[in-house]
Regions:
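Thiol/selenol-based redox catalytic cores and closely related redox-interacting motifs
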Residues: 31-109
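Local sequence-structure signature of Cys/Sec-based thiol-disulfide redox active-site neighborhoods
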Residues: 1-22, 26-32
Length: 109
């Protein structure tokens, strides 16, 4: 299982901790240190669409108007912190966030 997020993200840390506690092998990928390539980003955008960008974040609000009007891939490439997180890959399945439905899906296995 791979978690895409930020080392400093409290929700990412919580997800990683809970998954490891359940005995699930987790690889954490900090998207600032190792940005998503174009193919990975395109796959996530196909799966999650505009939900992949956290428009409530301070980082999003700090984007200039041109970037705010751009597509999600341009926004995330320019400022990876605007990506909603965590994104979790479990085999062929992708999950966004760490809400109850994601936890049930991943922790019930």
């Amino acid at each position: 299982m791979v978690i895409y997020g930020l080392e400093t993200c409290a929700v990412c840390q919580k997800a990683q901790k809970m998954l490891k506690f359940e005995g699930i092998e987790v690889i954490f990928r900090d998207i600032r240190a190792e940005p998503l390539n174009a193919e990975e980003l395109a796959e996530l955008i196909v799966e999650f669409g505009d939900n992949l960008v956290d428009r409530t974040s301070n980082d999003y609000r700090s984007l200039n108007n041109w970037l705010k009007a751009s597509e999600a891939d341009a926004q995330i490439t320019a400022k990876p912190k605007v990506m909603a997180r965590p994104v979790i890959r479990d085999g062929d399945s992708l999950y966004l966030g760490w809400d109850d439905s994601v936890q049930r899906a991943l922790l019930s296995n």
